[in-house]
Amino acid sequence: MMEINRNAPATADGELRIDADPATVFDVISGIDRWPSWNPDVKSVRVEGPVQPGTVFRWKAGPSSLTSTLRVVEPPWEIAWTGTTMGIKAVHVFRFQASDGGTLARSEESWEGLIARLLKGYSRRTLDKGIRGVLAHLKTEAERRAATA
């Protein structure tokens, strides 16, 4: 189990109930190379190996080019990675819990580094918006897949 840095200058978390089982939700988020097909915030992704701890993936989200490394891959309950962009060190964790025939999806992220410290308010708002966005897109795609299964 991986934790974000709760003492980082910028942190955000969110949760959302999804009408799909944890395996379906996990399949959506762990299919990293397919992120651009369901998350309009992700422009491109290149995964450099299988989806397992230690695998690097490079991706573009908004104005940022990111390099991330998978740290935890525990289907269907948790996936987490660390990443860097523009001097920001990020930790992003997704956890899934079965809930009333669906899934409670929780996402947490922390940012460290000079930019995150200097622009705390901006960093926190950006993170919060990103967490809300990815959970909403994840819900839409997982429920779409569950409906066609």
Where are these regions (language model features)?
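Short, conserved beta-turn/loop elements at beta-strand boundaries and strand-helix junctions
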Residues: E74-W77
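Hydrophobic/aromatic beta-strand elements that line small-molecule binding cavities or substrate pockets
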Residues: G14-L16, L66-V72, G83, V91-A98
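Short beta-strand segments that buttress and anchor functional surface loops
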Residues: T55-G62, I79-T85
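Hydrophobic ligand-binding cavity/cleft-lining segments
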Residues: M1-G49, E143, A149
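A short hydrophobic beta-strand element
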Residues: P53-T55, I79, T103-E108
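Beta-strand/loop substructures that line and gate deep hydrophobic ligand-binding cavities in soluble
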Residues: T84-T140, A149
